[in-house]
Amino acid sequence: MNKIHCHSSEEMPELMDGSVSLTVTSPPYWNAIDYDRHAENKGQYFRTRNYSNGFDDYENYLNWTAKIFEEVLRVTKPGGYCGIVIGTVLYNGRHYPVPFDLTSRLVREGWEFHQDIIWHKCTAGVKRAGVTIQKPYPGYYYPNIMTEYILIFRKSGPAIYKTIDVEDRKKSPIAINKLFTMDVANNIWHIAPVPPDLLDHPCPFPEEIPYRLISLYSYTGESVLDPFAGSGQTLKVARHLKRKFVGYEIIEKYVKLSEKRIAEPLAIREYQLIAEFAKIHWDTPSGERQSSQVKRIPGRRKKSPKNLTPTFL
């Protein structure tokens, strides 16, 4: 444990059966980002991914990914969890339901589907609604893609709290604060992505995601796995939350990046995002500013000047 292995996670001989409590990871995007090319030259990664190891076909990609999570199932202890951050993919005019197809395969392998959480990126996404604005007729509707899925799977077995004595449970309390009640408690999480070029990796997920998942699905001292370690976000957070960690990454540059970042301070942002709802007349013209038509839902407090929480309409 507490190591990053530089080889594929298709086989993880370093890990014994049932040795991992939780996996938090995000598989490579299918046909979206060329990680190899980015590793060679940060400025050169493309929206089309041509895999050198031969799984550029969608079915091959799904089978390859499912094979890795079959190995993850082996090393997960009974009752342990696996959190996967994954989104749908647009490619050559088609919209591929990657999260749903992968879920079907993982359930067939023996994973129990536990929860789905929607990651609302808030400030980033694939902008497509312009088509509808330019041609406002049925059949031209293509919504902006502002979300990814956080899929939670569980290995059959006793509930994890039943294997932890009462005193040890008290060492891993979940913070029940305003952020929890207004965001974490729901299955839609409003988390801004990592700003571009902040890390030398094309698509790191924000540290808030592994922070929440590790806090919610594991206890202090347990082991956390990331089979697609990338920039080391999961491993870094696991260490700070006093969990053991183990990662797998095939690109040596990213292994070195992860090893460096693990000891860095957490980058959890001081101000987190929540959704504050407001009412607007259903037929208000686009772009029209008529504050008199916007009515706040009773019971919601107004924003103060120091409140950096945006309102999502």
Question: What are these model-predicted stretches?
Answer:
Residues 1-257, 273, 287-290, 294-313:
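Core catalytic lobe of class I
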Residues 259-270:
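C-terminal helical cap(s) of enzyme catalytic domains, especially alpha/beta-barrels
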Residues 274-285:
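Post-kinase regulatory C-tail/linker adjacent to protein kinase catalytic domains
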